[in-house]
Swiss-Prot record:
Gene3D superfamilies: 2.40.40.20. It comes from Acinetobacter baylyi (strain ATCC 33305 / BD413 / ADP1). It is found in: Cytoplasm. Disulfide bonds: none annotated. Is synthesized initially as an inactive proenzyme, which is activated by self-cleavage at a specific serine bond to produce a beta-subunit with a hydroxyl group at its C-terminus and an alpha-subunit with a pyruvoyl group at its N-terminus. This is Aspartate 1-decarboxylase. Heterooctamer of four alpha and four beta subunits. It comes from the Bacteria. Substrate binds at T57, G73, G74, A75. Its EC number is 4.1.1.11. Its cofactor is pyruvate.
């Protein structure tokens, strides 16, 4: 049996473009994609921290070091320039793989440069 686990996420990136009439997808700065391990054309989940909307699309590579996070096509109705988003991917893992799995977590600065990376989410305390 396979378990679906968080593969990676880019946390608190800022939307730089919302292009309704561009072919659908989400363009992501190539440096962020590489650090997170997101492949071009991979399915991504986008969670808009600003407005609470969630949607699924696919990633396209943006220019390295550009800071671009461009929500395109119909998904542009779900985000505005300046919104904070979390971009995540999931993968299916065998039990052995799941036991050893550590997600790739990339934390973004407000200009979409990398603040830091991690491979676990801190324990939430009351």
């Amino acid at each position: 049996m396979l378990s679906r686990l968080l593969k990676c996420k880019i946390h608190r990136a800022v939307v730089t473009h919302a292009e309704l009439h561009y072919e659908g997808s989400c363009a992501i700065d190539g440096v962020l994609m590489d650090l997170a391990g997101i492949r071009e054309y991979e399915e991504i989940h986008v969670w808009n921290v600003t407005n609470g909307k969630r949607f699924t699309t696919y990633a396209i590579r943006g220019e390295d070091h550009s800071g671009i996070i461009s929500v395109n096509g119909g998904a542009a109705h779900q985000a505005e320039v300046g919104d904070l988003v979390i971009i995540a991917t999931f993968g299916d893992f065998t039990e052995v793989e799941a036991n050893a799995h550590k997600p790739r977590l990339v934390y973004a600065n407000p200009d979409n440069t990398v603040n830091h990376t991690a491979n676990c989410i801190p324990v939430q305390v009351a």
